[in-house]
């Protein structure tokens, strides 16, 4: 089949409705920010992540981060957006932030992805991308870190000699008491 025929066929298959279905299946929201005018458009999924509705004017997270982004993440977010838009990266923008839901004041983790469209002078004129709710992943990572810390605290206070070796019989973990017994530096 000639390539031009495949291209036309794909254009009929990949309709906006199907793209929206795919974004919904991936639990991703889509945004378009016109940098020149400051106007931003969000899909319903972005608005849901933000705790906003179509009836209200949702803030632009890029120009008003203080309204939706966690205080501890605002400077990092603004710096990373600026660095990306200034052309210091050749890969798409990816920033993980905590976002406040406007309707409940609860927080969720969101990865903001973006790709800039640039004019002939390489100045950014538009940023297009998706938001991904990563709260489940971040929660799991935090729980795993807490479990790891608890595990290390528990084994450090057991008076017995405890260590772990890999298949090559190399030490991969030893508690301080065991390290002292073996005469090696404590981990």
Label the model's feature ranges:
Residues 56-83, 91-95, 142:
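PAS/Per-ARNT-Sim sensory domains
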Residues 35, 117, 134:
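Hydrophobic pocket-lining residues within nucleotide cofactor-binding pockets
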Residues 72-76, 85-115, 121-125:
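Per-ARNT-Sim (PAS) sensory domains and their PAS-associated C-terminal
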Residues 1-21, 130-147:
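PAS-associated C-terminal cap
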Residues 15-66, 109-111, 154, 161-186:
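PAS-family sensory domain signal
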Residues 35-36, 102-103, 120-121, 167:
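Short, ordered coil/turn segments that flank beta-strands lining enzyme active or ligand-binding pockets
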């Amino acid at each position: 089949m000639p390539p031009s025929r495949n291209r036309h066929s794909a254009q009929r298959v990949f309709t906006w409705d199907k793209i929206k279905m795919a974004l919904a299946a991936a639990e991703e929201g889509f945004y378009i920010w016109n940098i020149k005018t400051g106007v931003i458009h969000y899909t319903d999924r972005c608005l849901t992540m933000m705790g906003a509705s179509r009836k209200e004017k949702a803030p632009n997270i890029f120009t008003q981060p203080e309204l939706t982004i966690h205080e501890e993440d605002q400077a990092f977010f603004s710096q990373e957006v600026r660095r990306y838009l200034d052309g210091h990266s050749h890969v798409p923008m990816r920033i993980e932030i905590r976002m406040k839901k406007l309707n409940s004041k609860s927080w969720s983790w969101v990865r903001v992805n973006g790709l800039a469209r640039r004019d002939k002078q390489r100045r950014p004129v538009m940023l297009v991308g998706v938001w991904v709710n990563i709260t489940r992943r971040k929660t799991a990572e935090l729980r795993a870190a807490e479990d790891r810390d608890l595990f290390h605290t528990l084994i450090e206070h057991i008076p017995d000699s405890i260590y772990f070796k890999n298949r090559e019989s190399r030490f991969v973990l030893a508690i301080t008491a065991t390290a002292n017994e073996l005469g090696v530096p404590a981990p």
